From Swiss-Prot:
The gene is petL. The 4 large subunits of the cytochrome b6-f complex are cytochrome b6, subunit IV (17 kDa polypeptide, PetD), cytochrome f and the Rieske protein, while the 4 small subunits are PetG, PetL, PetM and PetN. The complex functions as a dimer. Its main location: plastid. The keyword RNA-binding does not apply. GO terms for biological process: photosynthesis. HAMAP family: Cytb6_f_PetL (MF_00433). The keyword Phosphoprotein does not apply. Belongs to the PetL family. This is Cytochrome b6-f complex subunit 6. It comes from Calycanthus floridus var. glaucus. Keywords: Chloroplast, Electron transport, Membrane, Photosynthesis, Plastid, Thylakoid, Transmembrane, Transmembrane helix, Transport. GO terms for molecular function: electron transporter, transferring electrons within cytochrome b6/f complex of photosystem II activity.
Length: 31
């Protein structure tokens, strides 16, 4: 079932990218 695999892949990517974006925004604000 590729739909479930792509769904979990999307969740994994989102959970990895979101914190990175938040850290990047915090670093930009500190500058």
């Amino acid at each position: 079932m590729p739909t479930i695999t792509s769904y979990f892949g999307f969740l994994l990517a989102a959970s990895t990218i979101t914190p990175a974006l938040l850290i990047g925004l915090n670093k930009i604000r500190l500058i």
